[in-house]
């Protein structure tokens, strides 16, 4: 549960940052923020969550992060007592993994780590197709999504991309896959032709993962958000 459940917006005040407390700036429905939350959950790192209204962004947050995107990670440095801030989901996730030695998520082998990073970097082909479907071009988007899923089906050689248990790559890919059921009304049914059996098994394994379950937002709530998002009027807070 976020420390401030409501999404803060223009005119709000930045909650005071406490020493020895890690803060994540987030948005309840943002898949990029979910990446960081999955890493935090997988590594059992305590943190404070502050949700940001991404349409009506607080002035104080724009001073910390000019693009106004989430996630953002902030803390008070133990030695200098100055606040530190890191943006971008991949950078935040890598930092969390490198600074918390328990349950390391990145491979120790440099070549395997590079292979994983290639798949993560090329994942934009999946996210682009996903949003193409969501924003009203379902026919081309569905074709693109099915085409761009093939390399990921071929890359799976174990239960997870990381092997017998999830690694960083699994958590970085997951948020959009979790949202695939939202595309059914637009005509996309994952694995309807049976061409992605390994990815289908991976999805089942990920859904059973403790970190995934811990940060998942109920599908019905996400559907409500996406209805407003598609109309250009996203609603962030639901009673």
PLM features: what roles do these ranges have?
Residues 103, 127, 185, 224-225:
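A short hydrophobic/aromatic micro-motif that marks alpha-helical segments and, especially, helix-coil
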Residues 88, 182, 224:
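Short catalytic/ligand-binding loop motif for oxyanion handling, primarily in non-cytosolic enzymes
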């Amino acid at each position: 549960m976020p420390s401030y459940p409501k999404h803060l917006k223009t005119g709000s005040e930045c909650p005071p940052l406490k020493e020895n407390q890690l803060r994540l700036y987030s948005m309840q429905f943002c898949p990029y923020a979910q990446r960081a939350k999955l890493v935090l959950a997988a590594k059992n790192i305590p943190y404070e969550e502050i949700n940001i209204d991404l349409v009506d962004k607080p002035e104080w947050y724009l001073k910390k992060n000019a693009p106004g995107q989430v996630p953002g990670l902030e803390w008070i440095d133990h030695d200098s007592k100055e606040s530190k801030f890191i943006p971008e989901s991949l950078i935040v996730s890598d930092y969390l993994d490198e600074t918390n030695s328990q349950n390391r998520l990145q491979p120790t082998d440099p070549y395997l780590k590079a292979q994983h990073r290639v798949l993560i970097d090329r994942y934009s082909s999946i996210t682009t197709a996903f949003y193409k479907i969501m924003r009203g071009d379902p026919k081309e988007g569905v074709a693109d999504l099915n085409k761009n899923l093939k390399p990921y089906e071929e890359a799976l050689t174990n239960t997870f991309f990381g092997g017998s248990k999830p690694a960083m790559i699994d958590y970085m890919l997951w948020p959009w896959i979790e949202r695939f059921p939202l595309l059914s009304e637009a005509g996309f049914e994952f694995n309807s032709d049976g061409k992605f059996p390994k990815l289908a098994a991976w999805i089942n394994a990920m859904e059973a993962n403790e970190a995934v379950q811990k940060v998942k937002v109920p599908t019905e709530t996400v559907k409500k958000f996406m209805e407003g998002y598609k109309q250009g009027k996203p609603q962030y807070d639901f009673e």
